[in-house]
Design a protein with these regions (language model features):
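Short boundary segments that mark the start of a structured unit
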Residues: 1-54
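Glycan-recognition patch characteristic of GH18 chitinases/ENGases
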Residues: 51-174, 271-294
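Extracellular/periplasmic catalytic domains that process cell-envelope and extracellular macromolecules
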Residues: 57-60, 101-106, 148-150, 188-190, ...
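Structural recognition of the beta-strand scaffold that forms the well-ordered cores
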Residues: 64-69, 108-116, 154-160, 193-199, ...
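Structural recognition of alpha->loop->beta junctions
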Residues: 88-107, 172-203, 249-273
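Substrate-binding surface in catalytic domains of secreted glycosidases
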Residues: 129-130, 198-308
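Solvent-exposed, acidic/flexible segments
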Residues: 134-141, 172-176, 180, 210-218, ...
Length: 308
């Protein structure tokens, strides 16, 4: 039968390195087994796109900025519309001479949200839910994502809770392994640059759901780093109870969470108040917010923490 003739799933990835933009014809021949004459040729038409650098150069060195972009409301290329200029302190002339107006765009990391952790009550699985809008953006990635990456930005997905009562802080070991595998598939398939963890909207405490614990989230971060490797970004938004114990390796099961992170930053923002500077390493200083006292994340270089 046709079913019996199917091989195991094979993944083939074409790399466009050193190829000029254009269309290429690739005949791929698959043999049933070595030494047989039976084979099948599959013809691929592959389009290689030209890099799109846009109108403005990215100012990536002097200002480290992270964008969160809600794909339900905005398209990712909006990031390129945020501009800044720099003046020479001595002459008051444009310090960036590649344009007459001296403008550059900003944004080292673009986190696309939201991608949520859902719960399947029938199977007990923690499921990655991209949502229709995010999936549309990813399915049109050459239009919405690649131009941002061409300029040097890192484009990641922001992982959040899905309001089911299951979140990063109450996963079983089996759920962690399963969920990480799902995330890795998306990152690999779409050639994204990593993930951002922001544990909010999980709705912990729902009837029938496990209580929060202090080891699940650190295990998840560690497993994600090990799955994605060091070539992808793993970042953390430091926000409220889910991350408040990350300073204490006794609570985290011996895991120094910061060892598995590229960056972390404060998630506290209130548009009705002045800018809140959250600096766990200088708590008590006059400039540091007293509304949101935090402790240093174990193993994290202070230079890798965004205070605003």
């Amino acid at each position: 039968s046709a079913e019996n003739q199917r091989s195991a799933l094979k993944r083939i990835r074409f790399m466009a390195e050193n190829l000029a933009p254009g269309e290429y014809y690739l005949p791929l021949t698959v043999a049933e087994e070595a030494g047989t004459e039976e084979h099948q040729t599959i013809n691929y038409l592959i389009s290689i796109r030209a890099r799109q650098l846009g109108e403005y150069k990215l100012n990536a060195d002097q200002v480290f900025a992270v964008f969160y972009l809600d794909t339900e409301k905005y398209q990712p290329l909006l990031v390129d519309e945020y501009l800044m200029s720099k003046l020479d302190a001595n002459t008051w002339e444009n310090a960036w001479s590649e344009r007459e107006d001296g403008l550059r765009t900003i944004g080292n990391i673009v986190n696309l949200n939201k991608v949520v952790l859902d719960y399947d009550a029938e199977t007990g699985r923690a499921l990655l839910n991209l949502g229709n809008d995010m999936r549309y953006v990813l399915d049109h990635i050459d239009k919405y994502i690649r131009p941002l990456q061409d300029k040097g930005r890192k484009v990641c997905i922001c992982l959040e809770g899905g309001g089911t009562g299951l979140g990063f802080c109450n996963l079983t070991d089996a759920q962690i392994v399963d969920f990480v595998a799902q995330v890795k598939t998306v990152i690999t398939e779409y050639a994204l640059d990593g993930v951002n963890f922001w544990d909010r909207n999980a709705a912990y405490g729902k009837e029938g759901m496990p209580a929060m614990n202090t080891t699940s989230y650190p295990k998840l971060i560690k497993a994600m780093r090990e799955a994605l490797g060091n070539d992808k970004l793993v970042t953390l938004t430091d926000y409220e109870a889910p991350t408040e114990y990350f300073w204490d390796t006794g609570a985290t099961g011996g895991i120094e969470v910061g060892q598995y992170l590229d960056y972390a930053w404060s998630g506290y923002l209130d548009n009705e108040k002045n800018v809140q500077i959250v600096d766990p390493w200088h708590q008590g200083q006059q400039y540091v917010s007293t509304d949101h006292p935090r402790k240093p994340i174990a193993g994290l270089d202070p230079a890798k923490y965004g205070c605003i």
